[in-house]
């Protein structure tokens, strides 16, 4: 069984699945779209490094192994049709909804749930919505929330070693064959905001037409390689 999304192709092969990263980059619910040669391999390796780091911290991910240049061998998950966002600072849609200045600290990590639905612009929902709509139970939602905060704080610590600031990050979770909530999808500049002294190292470079996003993605990969080897 194969499935192709905006930025990845999933191929289920027996007990495992292959997650192939494409060179596509999108923004605005897919309305903005380009192909950047080499992006897929950058995001695949970045994800592999960061998920391996999380596994060493005792956090469950779907990663089994990285198959260069652009493929991850993963545990198949029954994915929740959700994006789970953790915010450490005000940015993006949070500022549009609630105001404030980009980069302002939030007093505690803020967790938000969004239904994956481009046509409805990924509506934000609360835990009660998830249960009423049959998307996830309250217990599953709490497990996702707990894991998302734990992962975010671990990644924040990882990047702080090089004086980079993790502003916010988006996750996707699923259930393994035993019903455990497990981190799936990817962790890359496609899914987080990463800054250093005002410089942007994430997809906002593409969203805002601020230069060459591929250059910044490469720099993040080099950063992850360097920190991983320490």
Swiss-Prot record:
GO molecular-function terms, A-Z: ATP binding; phosphoribosylaminoimidazolesuccinocarboxamide synthase activity
This protein's pathway: Purine metabolism; IMP biosynthesis via de novo pathway; 5-amino-1-(5-phospho-D-ribosyl)imidazole-4-carboxamide from 5-amino-1-(5-phospho-D-ribosyl)imidazole-4-carboxylate: step 1/2
Keyword Ligase in record: yes
EC number annotated for this UniProt entry: 6.3.2.6
InterPro entries, A to Z: SAICAR_synt/ADE2_N, SAICAR_synt_PurC, SAICAR_synthetase, SAICAR_synthetase_CS
Keywords assigned: ATP-binding, Ligase, Nucleotide-binding, Purine biosynthesis
Recorded catalytic activity of this chain's protein: 5-amino-1-(5-phospho-D-ribosyl)imidazole-4-carboxylate + L-aspartate + ATP = (2S)-2-[5-amino-1-(5-phospho-beta-D-ribosyl)imidazole-4-carboxamido]succinate + ADP + phosphate + 2 H(+)
Gene Ontology BP annotations: 'de novo' IMP biosynthetic process; cobalamin biosynthetic process
Pfam families given in the database record: SAICAR_synt
Similarity field: Belongs to the SAICAR synthetase family.
Protein name: Phosphoribosylaminoimidazole-succinocarboxamide synthase
Lineage: Bacteria, Thermotogati, Thermotogota, Thermotogae, Thermotogales
């Amino acid at each position: 069984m194969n499935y192709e999304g905006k930025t990845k192709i999933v191929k289920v092969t027996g007990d495992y699945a292959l997650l192939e990263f494409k060179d596509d980059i999108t923004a605005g619910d897919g309305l903005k779209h380009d192909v950047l040669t080499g992006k897929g391999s950058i995001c695949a390796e970045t994800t592999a490094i960061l998920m391996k780091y999380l596994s060493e911290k005792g956090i469950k991910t779907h990663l089994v192994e990285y198959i260069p240049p652009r493929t991850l061998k993963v545990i198949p998950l029954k994915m929740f049709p959700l994006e789970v966002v953790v915010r450490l600072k005000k940015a993006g849609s949070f500022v549009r909804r609630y105001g404030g200045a980009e980069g302002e600290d939030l007093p505690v990590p803020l967790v938000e749930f969004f239904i994956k639905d481009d046509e409805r612009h990924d509506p934000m929902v609360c835990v009660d919505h998830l249960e009423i709509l049959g998307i996830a139970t309250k217990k599953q939602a709490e497990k996702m929330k707990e894991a998302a905060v734990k992962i975010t704080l671990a990644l924040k610590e990882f990047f702080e070693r090089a004086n980079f600031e993790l502003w916010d990050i988006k996750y996707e979770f699923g259930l393994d064959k035993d019903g455990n909530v497990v981190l799936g999808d990817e962790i890359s500049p496609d899914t987080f905001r990463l800054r250093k002294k005002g410089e942007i190292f994430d997809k906002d470079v593409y969203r805002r037409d601020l230069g060459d996003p591929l250059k910044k993605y490469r720099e993040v990969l080099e950063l992850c390689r360097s920190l991983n080897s320490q």
